[in-house]
Amino acid sequence: MKNDLISQSSEYDCGPTCLLNAVRFLFEREEIQPGVLKHIWVMGNDTYCEKGRLGFHGTSRAAMRYMADWFREYGKHCGFPVDAEFLSGEDAAMVPGGKAWKWLEEGGCAVMRCFADKIPHYVLLTAILPEDEVGLFDPYDEEPDFREPGRRVIHGQPKKMNRAVRYALLNREDESDYAMGETAVRELILIRRTDGKDTV
């Protein structure tokens, strides 16, 4: 049985929530190993704010890169059929024929660093859709007020997506909602099953 994808629990935990949602998206509840869930929460929210409070700047790029490496090694050695890859800079692009695009077409998913209200944010990309759109699950699930075209709300697919966004918008270099921003700050964590089972 597949789990519904979940919203973040605070203003700061979009990173680990998206990693957890990647596992929920790819695997049946009965397949998920508790050690995977524990490790996601242990490694997330590793930053400190100016006042020295843990987690108040969310999850660092270093932690997300580490989690991609950890997923890959855990998949190789612990009987959990998962693989992951961390893409950054120019490699972190959502374009037809690109690496991230292919992983989504083959049933994988990608945790993407983007912007929301000009603040860094993570979302989970889950599907390539018609009309040049990508399906994604935004864990900050408030009813948005989209002021420009290219983004829309999806209802009734709690195990897969709650937004559809044109891929050209994802690749923008500004800080508009769901844009990845400048090349230097881009991150994609690609995650997929390695046993060939369908994720839908």
Residue ranges and their predicted role:
Residues 26-27, 31, 116, 199-200:
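Long non-globular sequence segments
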Residues 60, 93, 178-181:
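Intrinsic-disorder-associated interaction segments
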Residues 74, 78, 107-110, 196:
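Short secondary-structure junctions and interdomain/linker hinges
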